[in-house]
């Protein structure tokens, strides 16, 4: 499995298929990392389910176009908030419905009509018969905080637990972002049990918030040495890993 900045974070060229929990402060770069994670997996021809409560499919596709990632029927976009709104706040719109769709995507790659807009269904009609080979499925959730706000902690915990066990039986991997601090230590410890790897982002300097870094805290079944890796956010919405002491742009001096 490949992830953005893998070599810098782990000194490995690949890691086992994993579900990763990405934690960090507000606006530290978690959403950009998730989108870059998505772009990289699409380039690898993975089926991808992208869950985001604050964006639209059109906005996501425009961003992918802007960084040169081709549109594909393997991308499934879900905005749970839009679904609840379109249902008039209907309580029957539950997180379990999303889970069912994800499992359908695993069972029927590139033939499942997943998404908030009709574009995905049209793509599936046009291309579904051309490629029914089962591929890896990547799940990106940005963010768990928004899902908790919509569905409650218990529902989200059950959702992630089910995803975790599904990943052990199917070709499923992915990443879920969580803004911290937002859960108690005990709640976070329980959530951590449903992930194979923990990735942390932080501001490097409390004064200059342009300075950011990240580290892979652990990967189950693999010995790694956690190390902080500096990065900055690019204007095109991607993440650039910095070499120590050489590439960082001083925004104060500009």
Which stretches of residues belong to each language-model region?
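Conserved nucleotide-binding/hydrolysis micro-motifs of P-loop NTPases
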Residues: 54-58, 81-85, 144-146, 180-184, ...
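Sensor-1/coupling segment of RecA-like P-loop NTPase cores
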Residues: 164-183
